[in-house]
Every structure is written in C-alpha cells, then in structure tokens.
Amino acid sequence: TVTRELQRVALEKEQAQNCKINLYIADGKESQTSQNEQVDRFLERGYDVICVNIVDRTAAAVIVDKAQAAGVPVIFFNREPVEEDLRRWKHAYYVGLPAGDAGVLQGELVLDAWRTQRDTLDRNGDGVIQYVMLEGEPGHQDALLRTEFCISTLANAGVSAEKLASDAANWQRGQASVSMRQWLQEFGENIEVVFANNDDMALGAIDACAEAGLDKRSMPFIVGVDATPPALEALREGTLKGTVRNDAVGLAESMMELAVSLSVDGEASQDLELTDERYVWLRYEA
C-alpha cells in the first residue's frame, strides 16, 4: 500500500539525508467532514507538509484555502482534485497516475487477445465482445475513467463491444464475487470479458467462476488493475488474464521527495518533473 511504502521511503530518506522525518497518518473513513477536521488538527500542530487522499475530489478548495492561510504546502494524491481548486495556491500539488491510462492498457490487453486468440475469446462467434464491468466506488475518478477508457480503446480499434451488465463493487473482492455470481446465473457463457477497475474485484470474479465450477479454460477473459501479489499469483495460474501495475512505490517516492523538498527548501525538488507547476505524473504498466 501507499502508506507502507511511505513509511519505508521515510526511513530511507532519514538515513540518506541524516534528518528526522515524522509521519502522522489519519483515516478519513470516507467522510469529507472528518477529513477536514483532521486537516485542521494537523495545521494547528504545525506540521510542515500535509498529504491528502481527498474523500471528495470536488471539495479540495476548502483544504487548499486552509493550507494557504497557515502557509503549509498540501500534496493531494490518489484522487485528483478539480484543477481550479489546485490552482488556488502555488503550493498545492497533485501526485498520481492518469486514471484513464489504466483503462487504455486494460483495453489493449483485451485487444491483444482479440487479435491472437479470437476464436477462444469470441465464444459465440458474433464478432462482438460481450462484457461485464466491475466498477469501484460510485463517483471515484479512477473508477469513472478506467471504465470509460477501456471500452473507448476497443471502439477506437474498431472492435465492437456489448455491455451485458455493470455494478459498483466498491473495490471489494466480496462484493464483486456476489455480482459475478448473479451474472453467471443470468448470462452464463455469454460473458466473454470481465473488466474490473482493480485486482481485488477481478479476484472476486474469479472466486465466483470457481464456485460455479469453471476452470481457467472456461472462465471469461478477466482483467484488473494494480498488479497486487494475489493477482500476480492468479496471473501465473492462468485464471487472471491480465493486470495493470499501479506504481505505489513510485507514488510514495515522489510524494516524499516533494514533501521533503517543500519542507526544507520551500520549493519543489528539481529532481521531480512538474507539469504545469502542480502535477507529478507517474505511469501505469501492463
């Protein structure tokens, strides 16, 4: 996780730069009100930099204004704030991965299979990919863009796709398994591809397929995002057909580099490539 990687990177930076880095981590518990209160407490305690995985990406202005009033840089990550909010202050930043890229790479994984093993993928031979979609939490930017771009990638390549069903499984393996179980009962072998916004939901789909007695040869073509260890194991086993690596290590390293440079030097590190003076973009890998 990003939290674990941040703790690791902080220790490495302490040793490399002979300085003390204190990390204070709080859980907003999906409540923007609670998160705003936590930011207030951090500012009152005089922390040097605040990093925020914002609950509601449209509500960043409040936090940016609080940070500016206190003169404390704020780094958003994971959920990208609205651009206008980020530009309210020169020391508000975003570190993350373009969410649409993960969807594009998922689409390309399916396209590769369509080109190389079409007879296997196109079960009913109609020249159309029948798919189901397991989405993350409703309204989450990553979920919306991954969902949009995986399908637009197919369309841009001239491949027709038909959505049989979709459901918001909130990134959860258990919820995804329940949805997939229902779809298997309803659509059976007509499901050719399962797009999952993350690996946990992809694994939930695999769980449901296994419960239904399907082996890896008879399961749909299932793809996820994150390249988690359990997903990589499923990839080796052949039940998961593809995943996209979400660079938690690179995210943590970039956040820490930016936070330390802002704290020590008052400006972003020259080692970081800033886009529009606000954004540090990382990349997904399939």
Predicted regions and their residues:
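Short, solvent-exposed amphipathic alpha-helices that sit
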Residues: 2-16, 102-107, 141-160, 175, ...
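Hydrophobic alpha-helical segments within soluble ligand-binding/sensing domains
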Residues: 35, 94-126, 176-179, 227-231, ...
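Extracytoplasmic "Venus flytrap"
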Residues: 1-18, 23-38, 45-47, 53-57, ...
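Hydrophobic alpha-helical
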Residues: 39-45, 49-69, 74, 145, ...
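Hinge/cleft segment of the Venus flytrap/periplasmic-binding protein
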Residues: 127-138, 250-286
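Alpha-helix termini
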Residues: 11-18, 84, 113-126, 157, ...
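Flexible loop/hinge segments that line or gate small-molecule binding clefts
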Residues: 63-101, 117-128, 228-236, 240
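Short beta-strand elements in bilobed, periplasmic/extracellular small-molecule ligand-binding domains
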Residues: 12-28, 130-133, 155-173
